[in-house]
Amino acid sequence: MAQFRVTKRSMTKDIKPVHVIGAGMAGSEAAWQLAQAGVPVVLHEMRPLVKTDAHHTDGFAELVCSNSFRSDDHELNAVGLLHEEMRRAGSLLMEAAAVARVPAGGALAVDRDNFSNYVTEKLTAHPLVTVERGEIDGLPPADWDNAIIATGPLTSDALGKAIGELTGADELAFFDAIAPIVYRDSIDMSVCWFQSRYDKESAGSTAGAGGAGKDYINCPMTREQYEAFIDALLTGDKTEFKEWEKDTPYFDGCLPIEVMAERGPETLRFGPMKPVGLTNPHAPDVKAYAIVQLRQDNALGTLYNMVGFQTKLKHGEQTRVFRTIPGLEKAEFARLGGLHRNTFINSPKLLDPVMRLAKEPRLRFAGQITGVEGYVESGAMGLLAGRFAAAERLGRLPQTPPRTTALGALLAHITGDADATTFQPMNVNFGLFPPPEVPLDENGKRPRGKAKAPARKRAYTSRALADLEAWLRPRAEAAE
């Protein structure tokens, strides 16, 4: 077991370790929060001894889908607010994202290898963290009186079965999809061009290869090219589902592109291939019927991922179909798309307000297995689980964040606000927050027209950050 420092909290008393199962986004963040609070942690990760269908490394917090954490705007966007709340709460994931950041307009995107390496190095170097490699193939032993299960969308079959038997509830499953990655130098820039939608610049100090406001590579399509592409998507050979994967619903936030196309021929043109906010410098007077965007995937700018192009097409079909896109005729793929299954528990039915299993409170769940959707949301639930477990170990009552914060709104959703009979994965959004009081404008009137929506969003976010600071303050004072 790792040696740990004597702190004001522990005085000279030994503190039993908390066991964290899974070193993904949630588990890594939970372990960090515990260790930073002065609580020893045993972090269990089955990779590389037991592999998954989606992971490629044995690193912690490996990103297996997109490399984007979505919008970083903490004034007008709910996930951007969640970023900021996590930063203020001392998040390791947000620290790593700042180090590994790559250009992505107003989004927070990272070099996935640099990100994972940073998280792995920080945790393995922490004196209060012990890493144990190997599968936990059943429920945690009875002498683990405080354990966090953060095994994510690819929970091993053995552990998943044990959880199902314990909860007595049917697990739900769906698929997250992986988008292809293209080598930058194989893209024909005489056809494509660099531009962020509406020329929006990166939120940080980074800029894409094309310069400020030019973080994406855009591939234009005529109507004829778009319709031919849709036909190719619909008729292309797909990887067959295994028997245990059949009848599994998809989550709308990560639908395979061919599934979107099946919903109607115009669906993609009003989704990831929408042509708005972009002007082709090669033909400025010609409006594209549809546009495919590629986003920088690594710090060097040598890899670009196809935005929204998660797919279950067979690999040979992917190269054939995607090379019909103008500018990608000679594209070389660093990685082709694929799908992996995701499982989650019925959290509103099973968990208490501090994420413990009501039936067996020594077990706490965190991350995507709780039914949150997205890297940041998973990490956020890991942050809370770690803080709650640390409070218990240090003899304090866990304090939940205010529901007016992004952390609190998401937590409340999965631990009771959502309808357990129809519970489905959820991203953070302002619809989870209590409605705010929108301040009057300089004329003493309620904002109207175009000013109404941003004023309301700022009311959400300003209230959230003020309430977050009040929630964080007692812990900061206790640490002094």
Curated annotation (Swiss-Prot):
GO terms for cellular component: cytosol. Residues 446-458 have a biased composition (Basic residues). Its cofactor is FAD. Its EC number is 2.1.1.74. SUPFAM superfamilies: FAD/NAD(P)-binding domain. It comes from the Bacteria. Keywords: Cytoplasm, FAD, Flavoprotein, Methyltransferase, NAD, NADP, Transferase, tRNA processing. Disulfide bonds: none annotated. InterPro entries: FAD/NAD-bd_sf, MnmG-rel, MnmG-rel_CS, MnmG_N, TrmFO. Residues 438-458 are annotated as: Disordered. GO terms for molecular function: flavin adenine dinucleotide binding; tRNA (uracil(54)-C5)-methyltransferase activity, 5,10-methylenetetrahydrofolate-dependent. GO terms for biological process: tRNA methylation; tRNA wobble uridine modification. It catalyses: uridine(54) in tRNA + (6R)-5,10-methylene-5,6,7,8-tetrahydrofolate + NADH + H(+) = 5-methyluridine(54) in tRNA + (6S)-5,6,7,8-tetrahydrofolate + NAD(+); uridine(54) in tRNA + (6R)-5,10-methylene-5,6,7,8-tetrahydrofolate + NADPH + H(+) = 5-methyluridine(54) in tRNA + (6S)-5,6,7,8-tetrahydrofolate + NADP(+). FAD binds at G22, A23, G24, M25, A26, G27. It is found in: Cytoplasm. Its main location: cytoplasm. It holds the Pfam family GIDA. Catalyzes the folate-dependent formation of 5-methyl-uridine at position 54 (M-5-U54) in all tRNAs. Belongs to the MnmG family. TrmFO subfamily. This is Methylenetetrahydrofolate--tRNA-(uracil-5-)-methyltransferase TrmFO.
